[in-house]
Amino acid sequence: MPTIQLPDGSVKQFSKPVSVQAVAESIGTSLAKPALAGKIDDHLVDVSFIIDKDVSLRIITEKDPEGLEVIRHSAAHLLAHAVKELFPKAEVTIGPVVEDGFYYDFAFERSFTPEDLEKIEEKMRSLAKADLAVERRVLSRDEALTLFKKMGERYKVEIIRDIPKEEILTAYQQGDFIDLCRGPHVPRTGMLKAFKLTKLAGAYWRGDSNNEMLQRIYGTAWADTKALKAYLYRLEEAEKRDHRLLAKKMDLFHFQPESPGNVFWHPNGWSIILQMREYIRHITHKYGYQEVHTPQLIDASLWDKSGHLEKFGDDIFSLPLEPQQYVIKPMSCPAHVQIFNQGVKSYRDLPLRYAEFGACHRNEPSGTLHGLMRLRGFVQDDAHIFCTEDQIQSEVSAFIDQLHEVYADFGFTEVIHKLSTRPEKRVGSDEVWTKAEQALAEALNRKGVEWDILPGEGAFYGPKIEFSLRDCLGRIWQCGTVQVDFSVPERLGAHYIAEDGSKKPPVMIHRAILGSFERFLGILLEESAGKLPLWLAPVQVVVMNITDRQADYVGQTVENLQNLGIRAHSDLRNEKIGFKIREHTIARVPYLVVIGDREVADKTLSVRALEDEASTTITLEEFARQLKAEISQRSRKSPAPSPLFPVGGES
């Protein structure tokens, strides 16, 4: 007689084994009708699952995060079903859930087209409208192999052969279509109400470039049409804000196949990077860091001692320079330990804080490279703190203050904090791990921020806090990190003289705020749609004439602004003023100044801000004062546009 405990603490008893669906019906129609799955002791199951023992149960509906996962998983199967109906010769492979959607990979004799995508989506709607029952089937290994061989699904046969023999095999059938899957799935296809196929891509079978190239169809699925429309709007807005597109409009950078994953910075783009560097240099000095610089090429033996060569060998660039093997620096931590090791250090010298604009190179697979977001060559705002165990909490606390200040100055106010604790495989005693984890938790608590814990997600050498930013489109970007390291200092022979005269290895705290300058700039460009805060804008003011009569006054105005440290340019081209205004608006110049005969006569300026349609007449002195004030405050003219409403004007 199973006893079932529900989330509200109530208990239901049944005289015989009962399905999840039957439990939902016993609670009420309002819960049974939208039931998608059940969660039994933290394990998701189908609503057809039979409960034959005492359990805790939560009915999953479209309102639950797990419900969206079930919907998207089922939508992937609906996609495969539709493709097989329309293109019987297509072979199915895998179709997992991904962030905000799903995909399915197919092998087919020709490339799918956008027109095919429309037909497939229409077929999916037809199959959903048919409200087909979705049934779970348990298969023996021989049954599964026989079934999928008969169907001509060689990729499924390969998957089955790789599944451990002791594992139960399950498949899901809807109508005439059956697919290998662990589940769970929605009970009927009619519960899939809001989905959209979004794009086509190529993908190697099992992610191995030595295997066949497959065709990947991406889609998204949501609980209802309103949520789907909101997501599609965000997707459209994200495409407009793509930093690679903005880079062309703003003349920031480009890439070339001769140097994949490395940036060719144009003057405008490099100006932004330099402003970011100077700001980070200022903030690190403010918080007591000393700036250092370490070599790009370091003998592989150092990386072997630190453990990086063993753990990240495939991701590291190396150069054989006889008789030695050199590594192109992938990170700065071992090099910073070498600086610490020069001379005797006492507990009185700690904490020591070293900061570097660390130029790093990593051998990222070519298929993962993506604009500024994923590079092979990049610069980190890298820093390492050498301290005692008792200093961990205070150092992490100060770092969190520093990080929040930086994010606020760049215009980000929503920061997500996650504490990752000890994994199964780790170095260091449980006592030291407990002390470090408690120190990180206490640092977060003292700041009064909300945070989540990620059990077992820490690095093998110590716990860490990850800091992520939520942008105006709701996307999450992991940027900052602070990691406690018990391993590398000891491996590299670092020690200090403790108060009792003994030698002890220091704790090393790895920390970064931006992550990398390049990626952070990519995030910032997309967050602001290229409308950077004034202090970062590569060109802050463009001064334009209407006719040649104003050329001298334009030149004087630009010279005066430049003498005050304003990045001002003139535009004296013989073009219509409307053309010039539009061109510089597309380039996201924060302030445009138009000078005609009246402005020359009155010794004034006609100023138009990027976000404003109207212009203001102002003196040069007052304009310069306002510019300097805005730059010093590092403020935006207005908050980022809401993702709920379209952004007006040119994009």
Curated annotation (Swiss-Prot):
Cofactor or coenzyme needed: Zn(2+)
Region listing for Disordered, in residue ranges: 631-651
GO biological process: threonyl-tRNA aminoacylation
Cellular localisation: Cytoplasm
Enzyme class: ligase
Enzyme Commission number(s): 6.1.1.3
Superkingdom in the source lineage: Bacteria
Disulfide bonds: none
Protein name: Threonine--tRNA ligase
Species of provenance: Coxiella burnetii (strain RSA 493 / Nine Mile phase I)
